């Protein structure tokens, strides 16, 4: 789908690379048709996860090595994607060439969040808006919390799921806990270039952000910032941290939704009822 292949997508939070040199980005393969991995060497890069020799996958899950070696014929690559060596090819002429290196994909990092794509465009305006609104959050210090991960498959077109996310009229009837935690009458929606922001104002007694004076939301009892970035990325910020929701089309009437949790170290003890799950 062109609308997905030509846009930026969430790859990972840098905390997912803690202690690892490479992690497989399996969720992006279903979106983009390209096996990718995120590597941490002298810098964080998104590179192809396919060996340039015979197409074998290089990393299954994650690894912690200074080089990447193909498990099929032993071709070895650096963490910058460059081919380093291959058994029995020491005397080969004009080898290796640039064609033997792994493809490097565009990537952008913002406050610990890494985004990538095939030939993406248009994320800068979204990040500029988010920086102005929530740049005060220590998102780069959030820690990956595997226990908050979820995965659902639904019988619906991906756009129908996005439509459901973007309208709040169903909240009093479907999300009882969320409706109790938020002041429904003060629910706010703002549109910006490439996305939508919904702001949940807390009911009395609910956990809220400590918002600094320089923020446009100073003085508000904000319980959640819900960002949708076109076409299928949701970044839901709560006082406890961040829930990333990925919308992954499987067919015209099947969609997989993946949730990934990243927790602020000062709120690891909290579980709030403001999650927006299916």
PLM features per residue range, with description:
Residues 178-217:
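Polyanion-binding catalytic cores of nucleic-acid enzymes and NTP/SAM-utilizing transferases
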Residues 1-7, 11-12:
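Signature of the catalytic double-stranded beta-helix
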Residues 264-266:
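Acidic, proline/serine/threonine- and glycine-rich low-complexity intrinsically disordered segments
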